[in-house]
Amino acid sequence: MPKAPAKKAEPAPAPAPAPEPAPAPAAPAVDLSAVKVEFSADQIEDYREAFGLFDRVGDNKVAYNQIADIMRALGQNPTNKEVSKLLGNPSADDMTNKRVEFEAFLPMLQTIINSPNKAGFEDYVEGLRVFDKEGNGTVMGAELRIVLSTLGEKMTEAEIDALMAGQEDENGVVNYEAFVKHIMSV
């Protein structure tokens, strides 16, 4: 009798797909009610004046998306991520449409001023020194433009042009210590 062909073994069933990883939790919002505002009356008046310059509606409030600009106008340099965290990680729509009054702005400003993560002159110079191939205190302007447009908080071409205006010599080279002094004074 001819042998019946051996039955092929069924392939093992595919394993169940791994569960989707949980999305990373958004950075928790800062409890601004716990922030002690430590500004002098003169400072508060200066801050109120700067805040008022950004009030385009006349209701003594500014849009969420103006908070970082006001802080920068007051000499601080918060990242967009830091400001977003202060605002409770709002949506893009909220950034445009929600508004903040001056009294709510003060604890935000105090938080940024008290932040231990501030980079100083030497930190920025050290970061740019990596691109100083000659060891002579300069970097190529074109390379600096690429860095500004691709790393960290990416800048637009218009922002880079404004920042770099007058910084490159006739050979397209930038003295990075002078550049850092320039950007820290803007």
UniProtKB/Swiss-Prot annotation:
The keyword Repeat applies. SUPFAM superfamilies: EF-hand (SSF47473). Residues 12-26 have a biased composition (Pro residues). Keywords: Motor protein, Muscle protein, Myosin, Repeat. GO terms for molecular function: calcium ion binding. One of its GO terms (cellular component) is contractile muscle fiber. Coiled coil: none annotated. The modification Blocked amino end (Met) is found at residue 1. PROSITE patterns: EF_HAND_2. Signal peptide: none annotated. Residues 42-77, 119-154 form the EF-hand domain. Residues 1-26 are annotated as: Disordered. Myosin is a hexamer of 2 heavy chains and 4 light chains. In fish, myosin MLC1 and MLC3 appear to be produced by two different genes unlike in birds and mammals, where they are produced from a single gene by alternative splicing. This is Myosin light chain 1, skeletal muscle isoform.
